Amino acid sequence: MQGTLSVWLAKRGLIHRSLGFDYQGIETLQIKPEDWHAIAVILYVYGYNYLRLQCAYDVAPGGLLASVYHLTRIEYGVNQAEEVCIKVFTQRSNPRIPSVFWVWKSTDFQERESYDMLGITYDSHPRLKRILMPESWMGWPLRKDYIAPNFYEIQDAY
């Protein structure tokens, strides 16, 4: 079943895949990485002016990585804001997704965290570097195939 946004995108020839609705009735769409930046700009112009959340997850060991965006359309005088969930899947061997930092500035630290934990490179992000782990850390801790090191260095707070 397609939602209103999926129908609107299809009428304009924008390639996507409808993933149905989540348990709260929020429409979920899948966008290819190469189409994501253009569709993000279109969604912003269409009225999705607030990026509520960006996160990423490992679909399965050896499988795809996903970057998830929850967008909200906030309008003056409208009590119930429209929401949409966008999922962009990428290969784990060279995980690259266009950054939407220049569309929604609030994605800055969220994309950096996804890079730090899963190794997804967000192309054209102005400050893509580790944010939680030390720069010297090897690997991506939230990947399902990550092997934790046998040691952890604990530093005094003094």
Swiss-Prot record:
It is an enzyme of class 7 (translocase). Keywords: Chloroplast, Membrane, NAD, NADP, Plastid, Plastoquinone, Quinone, Thylakoid, Translocase, Transport. It comes from the Eukaryota. One of its GO terms (biological process) is photosynthesis, light reaction. One of its GO terms (molecular function) is NADH dehydrogenase (ubiquinone) activity. It is a peripheral membrane protein. The keyword Phosphoprotein does not apply. Its main location: plastid. One of its GO terms (cellular component) is chloroplast thylakoid membrane. Pfam families: Complex1_30kDa. NDH is composed of at least 16 different subunits, 5 of which are encoded in the nucleus. Belongs to the complex I 30 kDa subunit family. This is NAD(P)H-quinone oxidoreductase subunit J, chloroplastic. It comes from Draba nemorosa. The gene is ndhJ.
